[in-house]
Amino acid sequence: MAGRKGGDRKKAVTRSVKAGLQFPVGRIGRYLKKGRYAQRVGSGAPVYLAAVLEYLAAEVLELAGNAAKDNKKTRIIPRHLLLAVRNDQELGRLLAGVTIAHGGVIPNINSVLLPKKSPAAAEKEAKSQKAAAKSPKKKTAATKE
């Protein structure tokens, strides 16, 4: 008998679980109300905002994980976050005005600043690349004699 005072209570199910999200829907709703962004906040607004934030976080973390793997590291550091965000066109536009602490800069050298190759050096390099492309002939027992 589930009366007023005694009995078994149902286990509370959070809105995050109902929506299938990891980000806290209740906390985001509280922040929306407390921040006075509007007089009233709809019930779907914090769910939608939590989903958007979770998607963005997952996207950035995936790209940062790839950047860490490219650098043969197992831990994501701010440098990997910066490389992930700045090398992605859409995220780079979204976070254009954001500074990531200890992120460094994107490696870039203007082509005007690079040393110019002399025609002789360029020709010599082209010949060496052609020679490297050819595979050397193996000496067999018949050719050694």
Swiss-Prot record:
GO biological process terms held by the UniProt record: heterochromatin formation
Entry GO CC: nucleosome; nucleus
Stored InterPro entries: Histone-fold (IPR009072), Histone_H2A (IPR002119), Histone_H2A/H2B/H3 (IPR007125), Histone_H2A_C (IPR032454), Histone_H2A_CS (IPR032458)
Keywords: Chromosome, DNA-binding, Nucleosome core, Nucleus
Protein family: Belongs to the histone H2A family.
Subunit and partners: The nucleosome is a histone octamer containing two molecules each of H2A, H2B, H3 and H4 assembled in one H3-H4 heterotetramer and two H2A-H2B heterodimers. The octamer wraps approximately 147 bp of DNA.
Annotated protein name in UniProt: Protein H2A.5
Organism expressing this protein natively: Triticum aestivum
Gene (name only): H2A-2
